[in-house]
Amino acid sequence: VAFQRRKPAAIGFKAPFPGFVGPALASSIVRVPSGARWIHEIKFDGYRVQVHLANEAVKVFTRRGHDWTNRFKKVADDAWHIKAGSAIVDGEVVVPAADGTTDFSVLQNELKGKSTSIVLVAFDLLYLNGRDLRKLPLIQRKAELKKIIAGTEIQFSESFEIEAPTCSPMPARSAWRAWSPRSATAYTQRAGQ
């Protein structure tokens, strides 16, 4: 009997490619949310982007929907290696320093030339192979994202759980700019964005 590979079950909901999707943007909070509904991620200092892989082409959009594929040529080239027929990846374009920090002014300077230092840090997957994933839990979307970018130059933004009583403000000399709590449930874009 020959070995038969089972095709993984499709996730999400069958849907046409949606085009640009309004971003779920961070907002200021007074108290750190905790519990099963929340995960936390490092907030990088860069350009928020949405990478579209469709019809054998890659496009990179700003958070306002402007096509910056030519400005982020390296990111587009890196995204070409994503293991998917079609996808929408949400992330941040950064220039990482040796200590892991990111600095927006360094990124702006890199974009003045032909930068080879910029990197996409991916943190969400909104669409995959003809299926809309936005109603799925964030943890499930991130698990699929990690699979499709494995072996590429794209970095994966790990998430972590933290309880509000144990967290404190970021130290002034912290390697990270900030961290961002995200709802572990379905994707919600902010109105008017």
Language-model-derived ranges and their functions:
Residues 1-193:
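Catalytic cores of nucleic-acid ligases and guanylyltransferases
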